Amino acid sequence: HALCAQKNTAKTPVLTTTGERDAATDRLKMTVKDLLAMKAALDKLGVPTTNRRLVLCTDHVNDLLETDQRFKEQYNIDRNTGKVGKLYGFDIYEFANTPYYTSNGVKKAVGDKGDTAGDFHCSFAFYTQRVFKATGSTKMYWSPAENDPEYQRNKVNFRHYFICMFKKADAGVVMTSGYKAEA
């Protein structure tokens, strides 16, 4: 969620898909042209052509599988890492829980669902050298079975802190699905 722009800006563009309309959702499907628009947006920002990562939502993966033979051939190349492959200069991954965006291109808050017409998951691309991740402390919680007379079970749980964010929000692009209600 933190790697996606809040809204469209010059340094973090939010683009919309341009494909054909899905009759069930009124969502415009992602096309290869849209992928190239993401690449062009990063090129325009001066982002180096190496270390570009693209995270596709499941809707956009399905759209591309329907239409693009090259994408279909590269899909699921490495089942161990989840990496789809490299296409158009991107290391491509798939993630089912990308943020929702409104039809106006504004990111919804963490936990908000796409419950309004025109709210869809996004796909996003970023330059890996402009993001960081930090893993914090891990704490283990444990209680012995003697303290659980009802079920006589040992309980174990963990708390782990982790963060992933932009160092500087100037090398990312978001693609959200366009919306076209039936006329």
Cite the ranges covered by each PLM segment.
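Hydrophobic, aromatic-enriched interface-forming segments
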Residues: K29-Q74
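Alpha-helical scaffold segments that mediate packing/assembly in large oligomeric complexes
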Residues: H1-L45, V174-A183
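Sequence/fold signature of self-assembling virion shell proteins
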Residues: D26-M30, T67-A183
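Long, contiguous amphipathic alpha-helices that act as assembly "spine/axial" helices in icosahedral shell
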Residues: H1-G19, D43-T58, I92, A145-F166
